[in-house]
């Protein structure tokens, strides 16, 4: 029955870094996107 315990022993708890390449890529796209969506939404009221 030690075979069922083996996968649980292999899992080790990691503290993942916040600033990763994925984080930079996501925010480099997300922040301007939210800004432009807000700007486009604001333009709708400039009539």
Swiss-Prot record:
Domain of life of the organism encoding this protein: Bacteria
Chief location: membrane
Residue ranges the record marks as coiled coil: none
Residues that, per the record, bind heme: 27
Topology within the bilayer: Single-pass membrane protein
Entry's cofactor comment: With its partner (PsbE) binds heme. PSII binds additional chlorophylls, carotenoids and specific lipids.
SUPFAM superfamilies assigned to the protein according to its UniProt record, in alphabetical order: Cytochrome b559 subunits
UniProt cofactor(s): heme b
PROSITE patterns for the chain: CYTOCHROME_B559
Cellular component, GO, one term: photosystem II reaction center
Keyword Thylakoid in record: yes
Keywords assigned by UniProt, alphabetized: Electron transport, Heme, Iron, Membrane, Metal-binding, Photosynthesis, Photosystem II, Thylakoid, Transmembrane, Transmembrane helix, Transport
Localization in the cell: Cellular thylakoid membrane
Pfam families tied to this protein: Cytochrom_B559
Functional summary from the UniProt entry: This b-type cytochrome is tightly associated with the reaction center of photosystem II (PSII). PSII is a light-driven water:plastoquinone oxidoreductase that uses light energy to abstract electrons from H(2)O, generating O(2) and a proton gradient subsequently used for ATP formation. It consists of a core antenna complex that captures photons, and an electron transfer chain that converts photonic excitation into a charge separation.
Name used for this protein in its record: Cytochrome b559 subunit beta
Organism per entry: Prochlorococcus marinus subsp. pastoris (strain CCMP1986 / NIES-2087 / MED4)
Gene for this chain: psbF
């Amino acid at each position: 029955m030690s075979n069922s315990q083996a996968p649980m022993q292999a899992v080790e708890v990691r503290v993942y870094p916040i600033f990763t390449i994925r984080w930079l890529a996501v925010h480099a796209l997300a922040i301007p996107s939210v800004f432009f969506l807000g700007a486009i939404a604001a333009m709708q009221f400039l009539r």
